[in-house]
Regions:
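Solvent-exposed soluble domains appended to multi-pass membrane proteins
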Residues: 1-267
Length: 267
């Protein structure tokens, strides 16, 4: 893995500095997706992978959520847990138990199979949230639901072959925050980290990222790694957004954060 030994500021480190226990629960092996290296680098004290539960196969969402609930119920509060599911990572496989969604009038089986996969995830996620409510954890938690990448673009729904950045929406949902907003403008994944720092009361943490908190800054555009962009290109933030990928790459390849302290400013 390249740059796995680098120093990285992260939400996990920021919350550990505030006394949180931090744990990462993944459905695959620790060696997959470099979780064994990235978990401690991003501030996670404990990593649970499928072998932690005696499994040889990748954990389904239902099993992963059940095992995660068991762990969370016995973890000392406050804690920060990341739970990494996989069912919608490549959701093109035909479902073993199709629902009425499979009768959707389209020639694209990829579209139907993807809808089925997200339907299954929604059901399992809903069941997990109900379980958190039943054991009393839900009311004491801020819950972030975030996608790391898109899968089937909206262009498929429209019958368009070419996929643009506008077709590549990903989920970002926050539950139980002090704020109530529905963000209608364009924003990017680069804005997730500073938004989570903000909602968790970590605004004095030494590194706030290259994006902006959506609760404080009117973000109206996003820029992809290939230079394509979406939204208001006249935004005063746009120029910095176009530079962020190059800045990030230089920071990673040069181990920019090595030897730096990321304590809270008031300290």
């Amino acid at each position: 893995m390249l740059y796995g030994e680098n120093t990285y500021p992260a939400l996990g480190h920021a919350l550990r500095d505030k006394g949180y226990r931090t744990l990462n629960i993944v459905c695959d092996r620790a060696q997959d997706w470099n979780q064994a290296e990235t978990s401690p680098a991003y501030g996670f004290e404990t990593l649970y992978d499928k072998t932690s539960f005696g499994a040889s196969e990748t954990l389904s969402d239902s099993v992963l959520f059940a095992e995660s609930l068991s762990i969370l119920k016995r973890t000392q509060e406050p804690f920060f847990s990341q739970i990494v599911t996989i069912s919608t990572h490549a959701p093109n496989k035909a479902p073993s138990n199709p629902t009425a969604l499979s009768r959707y009038p389209t020639e694209s089986r990829d579209l139907v199979n993807t809808m089925e996969a997200f339907h299954r995830l929604d059901r399992q996620l809903g069941s997990f949230l109900d379980s958190l409510k039943a054991c009393g954890l839900y009311e004491r938690s801020v819950i972030a639901i975030v996608s790391d990448h898109d899968e089937l673009g909206k262009n498929v729904l429209d019958g368009r072959e070419h996929r643009t950045l506008a077709d590549r929406e990903v989920a970002f949902v926050l539950l139980n925050t002090p704020y109530t907003i529905s963000y209608e403008e364009t924003a990017g994944q680069i804005d997730v980290y500073p938004t989570l720092l903000d909602v968790m009361g970590c605004n004095e943490y030494g590194w706030k990222g290259l994006g902006y908190s959506l609760f404080r800054t009117p973000v109206e555009s996003a820029v992809y790694w290939d230079g394509s962009s979406l939204g208001n290109r006249r935004s005063p933030l746009y120029s910095r957004q176009t530079q962020a990928w190059d800045i990030s790459r230089l920071m990673i390849t040069g181990d920019f954060f090595s030897g730096k302290s990321f304590g809270y400013d008031e300290e």
